[in-house]
Amino acid sequence: IRDSLVTGVQTCALPISYVDFGGESAVPLVERYPNLLVTGTFSKSRSLAGLRLGYAIGSRELIEGLERIKNSFNSYPVDSLASAVGVAALEDKAYFEACREQVMTTRERTRRRLGDLGFEVLPSQTNFLLVHHPDHEAAQQFVGLRERSILVRHFNTEALRDFMRISIGTEDEMDSLIEAMEAMIR
């Protein structure tokens, strides 16, 4: 990213949607690179997906450019209710930290348990895991979980065909997932 910013890319937009789950934020780079626009959302770590509320951090010039075109491209204008909810979400730091820690703890616990069942679990700093079992097709596991009313994602693309995307839920939900997966592979 730094190379792109230095070598003359006009503008580099970098989403940091999952950074609160353990990633490294690019926000500090904004001061050094005036062509960097960092974007974020309240959908992931703030659990406000239906609100369609996000933000952008960048140089004054980039933000002014966004202001000029926002009504042409933004299909989700921010109303006063969404704005108030966003401010409240930012102010309640204790609740945010508790939820964030719970997701990360549950993610790591789930990762370990899936690993114990023989799954390959890709490293994650998000609120989901990408998992693959060398002896069982992901598409069949996806169907088996759906039949048990457990919803995960399976992408029928070459790069992800062998993987399932498992969103991190409550501990009870993840226990149910593990039990179902264990029953399917045994």
Language-model regions, residue ranges each:
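Conserved core of the PLP fold type I
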Residues: 2, 18-33, 37
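Short acidic/glycine-enriched loop/turn segments that link adjacent beta-strands
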Residues: 50, 125, 159-162
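PLP-dependent aminotransferase class I/II
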Residues: 35-115, 119-122
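Conserved PLP-binding catalytic core of the aspartate aminotransferase-like
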Residues: 103-104, 113-148, 164
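Single conserved hydrophobic/aromatic residue that forms the stacking wall/gate
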Residues: 1-12, 16
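Short beta-strand-to-loop capping motifs
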Residues: 58, 131-135, 168-170
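PLP-dependent enzyme catalytic core of the Aspartate aminotransferase-like
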Residues: 144-153, 157-186
